[in-house]
Amino acid sequence: MGRLVGKVCIVTGAASGIGAETVRRFKEEGASVVGVDLHDRSQGVDLALACDVADEDAVRGMFEAVRAEYDSIDVLFNNAGISPPEDASVLETETAVWDRVQDVNVKSVFFCCKYGIPHLLETGGGSVINTASFVAVMGAATSQIAYTASKGAVLSLSRELGVEFARRGVRVNALCPGPVSTPLLNELFARDPEKAARRLVHLPMGRFAEAVEIANAALFLASDESSYITASTFLVDGGLSGAYTTPVTAE
């Protein structure tokens, strides 16, 4: 039997990258999946909804639409996020870029938790997975200051909620991927190959993660197999955060 049979799972940012792979893995494990994206173009889902997750009223309406279709909500994967190329050093990044990144990367998680967690509580609990990043626990000279700050906020928010709701049946964890081979990252690094090379050299495994590897971690956190895990910084970074120097060869 699949690990998510009988569970209703909401995935934001479901149309591409980690979100799309997570939709596929959740479906393979028996979940009913609601795919949420800026446009209703999520593939392979049971219900596709268009929602600007940085808009509070839109998020509230999204959850109402889900409950109109399903009796419960069991898993929230708050995964939507942006990393615009204009986001760079604090000396260069415009305030408008900062604000846009915080709106999409932080406010969206706040809104989805604010309006989603009550539905989990109503039916006895569930799992909330918020996509943070390895940059929430490490610094980088190749700065993306708005993105880094936003993911630090998601990490702190997740830890707080994980503790707050621990005895009410709702687990909340921050999923912290390392660099992932997604359209978003590939587009960013195509514009700046030097930035890509400077990051790749620090990865002990010598490669970026594949989106399905992050999706598998989300699947674990969504399932009852992770029933004693909450308020965690769940790193899936190929050893990056634990490395000082990296192997020269595969010997």
Regions found by a protein language model. Name each.
Residues 87, 219, 230-251:
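Short C-terminal tail/terminal secondary-structure segment
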